[in-house]
Amino acid sequence: MSTSMTKEIQEKELTMLLYFKEFCDKHNLRFYLCGGGLIGAIRHNGFIPWDDDLDLFMPRPDYEKLAELWPKYADTERYTYCRTDRHHIYHDAGASIRDNNTTFINRHSMHEDICHGLALEIMPIDGCAPGKISRALQLMWAMTFALFNAQRLPDNKGPMYRALAGCIYKVFSSQSVRYHIWRFAEKQMTKYDFNTSKECTELIGSLKGMKLRHPQEDFASVVYKDFEGHQIPVMKGYERYLRLIWGDYMQLPPVEQRVAKHDAAFADLHTPYKKYRGIYYAQNKAQP
């Protein structure tokens, strides 16, 4: 991906972020920068120069409220709330807000008839199970959820998990069966309330992230950091979180690793994705 394209993506995502922040402030929803966006805020006061996406965390209660409030009160002509359900498969276990006036088709979902606008990715933070057995069960259900919800061979959980996933998909090929499995798994893994748990955890994402436990106070409140000239919330315990995930997060990675991570099959930031239905995505579908 070219530097100019990356810069344009960042400009679009900043606009989306500011709208999202305005919406969350209005409806008293908590969120924080995470991933590259968090490192960018702390190390660069904005985007990492080569980063082509923006990820957010929300406590599970706020994450679920967002799903209810967005369709009612947001500008849905402009931005769509997206999340895998019985009828739409995004091949991503989290949620997203997508810009309807853009096109950004990820290779892993190019066959799906879904919203293919540029995305602001959102992942929940959940209450962590307190005991060893309950925690092991929570992780088991989290991996089951990820497997059947995302419905693609994982590239961030190791080769053994990837091989096992391929076998399981062959056995459970029915979309209806997969849906009921991940819905049940989701209920089991999220039964520990975020607000009353002593620790919290990421149940969506990499296997490394799933295994980590964070003090609840690190995520209970926010501090604001400069991000491209705007004050954006990050979790109060961002330093401990970043050290745990990345170690020396202020150290720049080797030059060869400073590349955009998304594998886009096609991108056009000036044209609504629906214009490309049947051409660059859902090619077995006729245009309306």
Language-model features: where?
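Active-site nucleotide-donor binding segment shared across nucleotidyl transfer reactions
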Residues: 21-54, 58-64, 217, 244-245
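Conserved catalytic core of two-metal-ion nucleotidyltransferases
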Residues: 2-27, 70-130, 149-246, 252-288
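A short secondary-structure junction signal
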Residues: 131-137
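Short, His- and charge-rich active-site/binding loops that engage polyanionic ligands
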Residues: 140-141
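Conserved SAM-binding loop
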Residues: 66-68
